[in-house]
Structure formats: structure tokens, C-alpha cells
């Protein structure tokens, strides 16, 4: 074990079929995009239903270091008013701490282009392994200077803004194969460039394209003008003064709904999540369809004017054969937990980029599935999970690798496998500050 065997959390078994309603906090992806866009405007913006977790708190801390005010409502900490710097320029000669948050380390560096001095970036030691170079290469193409204080292309580093930004349309080419966040980080700030931006992705595949579409929709919603040519892998953004509406409500995090809705397939019974949007740019919006393919009954009832996603399972799980998860790789750990109990093998493909997430998620999933007696192996672009007899599965102390989705993965296995203990379940605070309470509450209902 690479983590200390302290504060082990015994994952609770599901003693009976579930019948639970679980309210999921706001979307991390949308919360951190809205925070960036609010900071790039000229007027205060109140964000309602903002996720409060380590990642969003790190984002607010980063913005405050740059001179942005983030005022938390005294009545509810999920309402935050963001006020950009009065001068219209971000503070330089400051330190930004990114923790292990990919959205912070890849979205905030772009703001340094508009700072009045150098900005230093650092993070958790584990963050030093996360790739950063494409977005930083993009900023260098825009005239910034990047000084690395460790390995090139990784934290820690200092960004010095250029004396002047390009007056003509900027031409930037990067290989974003490792993460869609490299493209999103540049698109978020592109409208503020004097001549706008023409951004080209030079890699063969574009990972997590729905996340890029989310960014495009959010930039457009703030007044930006983006022309996307996904087949050519290019995005052209006009220079515009962007401003979010004075009040913006954040959708629930549909990817964080995956462990709870997926629990209905593993344990049997029904789980409902309220405030499910009719349309969404979140990749987690694909989840209900995936669960249906695995054998769940899925419906979207409206109760008291609120739209729910309702998932019912009977404890049986259909394997999926070859299954392309390119569009929603972040829910791969939750789907993997369900597929451990499937009737046939599944090859989840299109998710090679998960090797560069909080941990190497493909390697971690294989390790932990094998740890409980399951059968799994890495593929060049994904993961194979094969069925095993139920009696082969057994309890274990499970690693989480400081990765929130590996912790929720372990909890899902614990619904059906006795004696699962989870190391550092507190890592779920990255996106679900009360995961343990929510999970226990689901089982008590």
C-alpha cells in the first residue's frame, strides 16, 4: 500500500434493494467554468448552486490571489458573488495554488496573460505528474514566457505576461490528446484577446469532446462568438467583451450522480436524482442511456414541478462488449464498478487519456478490480473487465490514489462485496464534500 492504513472507511453493504432519492451538488465542470468567465467580465455575477468542494474552493482561492472577489452568501455557501478587479487587470507577483485540480491548473494560467506581473503556479506533489505542456505551449504562442521550476511541461512554473498581446487574430496550435482541458483553458480566455483566436488541435483524436462543447456553450452564453469545426479540430473565436448574466444557476453534477444511480444496478432497487436537466452540455448526461444498456429501467418523472432521473435495477448487469466511452471518460470508474458484476466481458475503449487524470485511472482500476478477486486488464486505449463467479469476489483494503473517483468506485463495489475497506475516502471532498453522509443516507432510506 502506498497510502497510510489510517482512517479506513468500511464501505457499507446493501442489505436490501434501494429506494432512495439523492440530491447531488452542483457541477464541478460548470462551477469552475462559470467562476473563470465571471472573473473575465466587468460586472459582479452571482452564482447559485455552486459546488463547494476542494476543487471549487481552490478555484476561488486562485481567483482571489489574482484580485477577484468571491463573496460567499451568509445564508447559503453555495451562492457566491464574483466581482472582477476594478482595474480590469489581474494582479501579478502573486502565488496561485492549484492543489490537484485539473481545472485550476489548466484554466487559470490563461488569466495570467492579463495580469500586471508574473504569476507563480504550484500544487500538490501529486499534481507534478499531471501534464500541462499543451496549454502552456499555447500561452507561449500568445507571447507569454513560462519558466519551469521542475520538469518542463509540469508544475511548478511562473508565467510572465507579454508586454502587448497580438493585435491580429492569434494562431495557436496544440496537441490536446491528453486532455480536453487544454483546449477549454484557451477557449475560456480567447474572447479577451485583442484579435481573437484561431485554435487548432493537432492530435488525431479529441478526448472528452462534450467538455469542449460545454466550454463553447458557456463562452457563447457569456456573449462570446465561437465557430467550431470539430471535423477539422479547429475553433475560431472573435474578440468580444464577455459578461455572464447577473445571476447564473449551476446544474447538478451529473457525473457525480453516477455512483448513486449506478448503485441501483449493483444492489437492486430504485434511486432518483432530482433537478435532472432536459438538455445539458455535461458528459454525465449520457449516463442514463449507458445504464439502460446495462439492463436498468430508466425514466424521467416530474414530481412537484421537479424533473428526476429514476433508475431501477434488479441486481443483474449486462456486459457491453466493445463500448466506446470517448465522450464521457470521467464516469468510467463508476461504470467499471457496475461491470465487475456483469454477465459478460466489456472492453471500454476511447479512454486512454485517463492515464493522465488524478492518477493513472486505467492502471488503478485494474489493480483494484484484481484486488477484490475480479478480472481486468489494460488495453492500449482502455480497459477490459471480464466476469468472474460471485464467490471469487472478496473483501480487501482498497487504495484510492488520492483520486475521488477511485474512492466512489470502491464504495460501489462495497454494496455487494462484504468487508471492503477504503483508504482515504476523504479524497471525495474534491467534488463531493459529504460523500460518506450521502452514501450512508442512500442506504438508510
Swiss-Prot record:
Residues at the active site: 330
Example GO biological process: chorismate biosynthetic process
GO MF annotation list: 3-phosphoshikimate 1-carboxyvinyltransferase activity
Any Pfam family matching the protein: EPSP_synthase
The keyword Phosphoprotein belongs to this UniProt entry's keyword annotation: no
Keywords attached to this entry: Amino-acid biosynthesis, Aromatic amino acid biosynthesis, Cytoplasm, Transferase
GO cellular component labels: cytoplasm
Annotated compartments: Cytoplasm
Intrachain S-S bonds: none
Database matches in Gene3D superfamilies: Enolpyruvate transferase domain
Entry-linked InterPro entries: Enolpyruvate_Tfrase_dom (IPR001986), Enolpyruvate_Tfrase_sf (IPR036968), EPSP_synthase (IPR006264), EPSP_synthase_CS (IPR023193), RNA3'P_cycl/enolpyr_Trfase_a/b (IPR013792)
Enzyme nomenclature, EC number: 2.5.1.19
Protein residues bound to phosphoenolpyruvate: 28, 102, 130, 181, 361, 405, 430
Catalytic activity: 3-phosphoshikimate + phosphoenolpyruvate = 5-O-(1-carboxyvinyl)-3-phosphoshikimate + phosphate
Sequence positions that bind 3-phosphoshikimate: 28-29, 33, 179-181, 330, 357
Pathway given in the UniProt record: Metabolic intermediate biosynthesis; chorismate biosynthesis; chorismate from D-erythrose 4-phosphate and phosphoenolpyruvate: step 6/7
Purpose of the protein: Catalyzes the transfer of the enolpyruvyl moiety of phosphoenolpyruvate (PEP) to the 5-hydroxyl of shikimate-3-phosphate (S3P) to produce enolpyruvyl shikimate-3-phosphate and inorganic phosphate.
Family: Belongs to the EPSP synthase family.
HAMAP family (alphabetical): EPSP_synth
Description of how the protein assembles with itself and partners: Monomer.
Protein name per the record: 3-phosphoshikimate 1-carboxyvinyltransferase
Amino acid at each position: 500500500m502506498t497510502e497510510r492504513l489510517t482512517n479506513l472507511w468500511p464501505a457499507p453493504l446493501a442489505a436490501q434493494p434501494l429506494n432512495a432519492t439523492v440530491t447531488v451538488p452542483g457541477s464541478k465542470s460548470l462551477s469552475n467554468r462559470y467562476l473563470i468567465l465571471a472573473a473575465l467580465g466587468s460586472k459582479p455575477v452571482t452564482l447559485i448552486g455552486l459546488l463547494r468542494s476542494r476543487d471549487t474552493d481552490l478555484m476561488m482561492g486562485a481567483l482571489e490571489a489574482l484580485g477577484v472577489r468571491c463573496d460567499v452568501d451568509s445564508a447559503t455557501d453555495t451562492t457566491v458573488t464574483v466581482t472582477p478587479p476594478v482595474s480590469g487587470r489581474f494582479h501579478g507577483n502573486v502565488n496561485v495554488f492549484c492543489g490537484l485540480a485539473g481545472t485550476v491548473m489548466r484554466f487559470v494560467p490563461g488569466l495570467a496573460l492579463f495580469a500586471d506581473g508574473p504569476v507563480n503556479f504550484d500544487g500538490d506533489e501529486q499534481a507534478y505528474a499531471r501534464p500541462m505542456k499543451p496549454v502552456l505551449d499555447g500561452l507561449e504562442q500568445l507571447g507569454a514566457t513560462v519558466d519551469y521550476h521542475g520538469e518542463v511541461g509540469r508544475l511548478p512554473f511562473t508565467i510572465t505576461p507579454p508586454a502587448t498581446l497580438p493585435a491580429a487574430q492569434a494562431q495557436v496550435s496544440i496537441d490536446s490528446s491528453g486532455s480536453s482541458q487544454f483546449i477549454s483553458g484557451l477557449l475560456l480566455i480567447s474572447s479577451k484577446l485583442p484579435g481573437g483566436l484561431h485554435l487548432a488541435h493537432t492530435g488525431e483524436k479529441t478526448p472528452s469532446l462534450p467538455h469542449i462543447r460545454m466550454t463553447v456553450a458557456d463562452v457563447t452564453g457569456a456573449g462570446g462568438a465561437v465557430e467550431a469545426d470539430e471535423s477539422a479540430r479547429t475553433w475560431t473565436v472573435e474578440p468580444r467583451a464577455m459578461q455572464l448574466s447577473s445571476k447564473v444557476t449551476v446544474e447538478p453534477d451529473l457525473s457525480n450522480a453516477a455512483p448513486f444511480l449506478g448503485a441501483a444496478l449493483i444492489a437492486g432497487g430504485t434511486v432518483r436524482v432530482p433537478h435532472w436537466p432536459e438538455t445539458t452540455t455535461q458528459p454525465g448526461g449520457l449516463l442514463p442511456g449507458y445504464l439502460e444498456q446495462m439492463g436498468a429501467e430508466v425514466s424521467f418523472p416530474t414530481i412537484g414541478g421537479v424533473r428526476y432521473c429514476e433508475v431501477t435495477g434488479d441486481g443483474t448487469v449486462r456486459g457491453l462488449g466493445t463500448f466506446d466511452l470517448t465522450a464521457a471518460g470521467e464516469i468510467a470508474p463508476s461504470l467499471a464498478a457496475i461491470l465487475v458484476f456483469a454477465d459478460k466481458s466489456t472492453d471500454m475503449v476511447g479512454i486512454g487519456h485517463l492515464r493522465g487524470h488524478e492518477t493513472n485511472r486505467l492502471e488503478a482500476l485494474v489493480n483494484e478490480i484484481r484486488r477484490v478477486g475480479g478480472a481486468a486488464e489494460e488495453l492500449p486505449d482502455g480497459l477490459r473487465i471480464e466476469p468472474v463467479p460471485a464467490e471469487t469476489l472478496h473483501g480487501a483494503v482498497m487504495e484510492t490514489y488520492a483520486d475521488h473517483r477511485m474512492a466512489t468506485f470502491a464504495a460501489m463495489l462495497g454494496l455487494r462485496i462484504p468487508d471492503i475497506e477504503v483508504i482515504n475516502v476523504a479524497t471525495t471532498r474534491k467534488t463531493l464534500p459529504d460523500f460518506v453522509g450521502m452514501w450512508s443516507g442512500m442506504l438508510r432510506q
